[in-house]
Design a protein with these regions (language model features):
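Beta-strand-rich, repetitive solenoid scaffolds
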Residues: 1-24, 28-32, 36-41, 45-51, ...
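Solvent-exposed, conformationally flexible loop/turn segments
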Residues: 101, 169-173
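Conserved short histidine dyad/triad with adjacent acidic residue
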Residues: 120
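Extended extracellular/luminal ectodomain segments enriched in beta-structured repeat modules
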Residues: 131-133
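Short, intrinsically disordered N-terminal pre-domain segments
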Residues: 193-197
């Protein structure tokens, strides 16, 4: 196939076996029609669209998925046409260490899996930035002295409205799991007096 550039006064077509766009700085694709499409053999496959300044990425062939591969071709993430995401391996929220202090703050959006070592009797603030339906976990660890207590913010809801009594043994941990209902962090599980090493 020979290279050619064709224009009809409205549209421009560039044809070639291989086409390389090489810019010393940036490349900007600016589509006032709000859509940028990738096609294969004349069939649209993937689209990027502007929806009130939200970016929409979607396959343009019905009943097809968007699949992310790592370098060796292994599938890592599949955005399935059935409206779910499938991970080849676990999706992991790294454990965050909360800052110990008189009041312990916790961001549920960036610290979903958290731990704190108590250096005294503390108040646990309500986990901020919660999303309805979100699960979070907190490992509360006694320091080398032990017998530290926690006063829980009213946003944490426990069975029978009774807050738990922490383990008092030095260096042991208590693990709590909560689910957010839009206004309260509902406890869904706990394990007390855990040996951590």
């Amino acid at each position: 196939m020979s290279e050619k550039i064709e224009g009809d006064g409205t549209d421009l077509t560039i044809s070639a076996n291989n086409l390389t766009i090489d810019a010393a700085a940036d490349i900007t694709l600016d589509a006032d029609g709000a859509d940028i499409k990738f096609a294969d053999g004349g069939t649209d496959l993937l689209g990027f669209a502007n929806s009130s300044s939200d970016v929409v990425i979607k396959p343009l062939v019905n009943a097809k998925d968007i699949i992310f591969h790592q370098y060796d071709g292994t599938s890592i993430l599949e955005i399935n046409d059935g409206a779910y995401a499938k991970f080849t391996a676990a999706a992991v929220a790294p454990e965050a260490t909360l800052t110990d202090g008189a009041t312990v703050s916790w961001n549920a959006l960036t610290q979903q899996v958290a731990k704190v070592t108590l250096g005294g009797n503390r108040t646990l603030a309500s986990a901020s930035s919660g999303v309805t339906g979100e699960f979070i976990s907190l490992l509360v660890i006694q320091d080398g002295t032990g017998s530290r207590t926690v006063t829980w913010n009213a946003a944490y809801e426990f069975a029978s409205d009774t807050a738990p009594t922490l383990t008092t043994t030095a260096n042991l941990g208590d693990l709590f799991v909560f689910r957010y209902n839009g206004s309260k962090w509902l406890e869904v599980g706990r394990n007390l007096a855990l040996t951590l090493s």
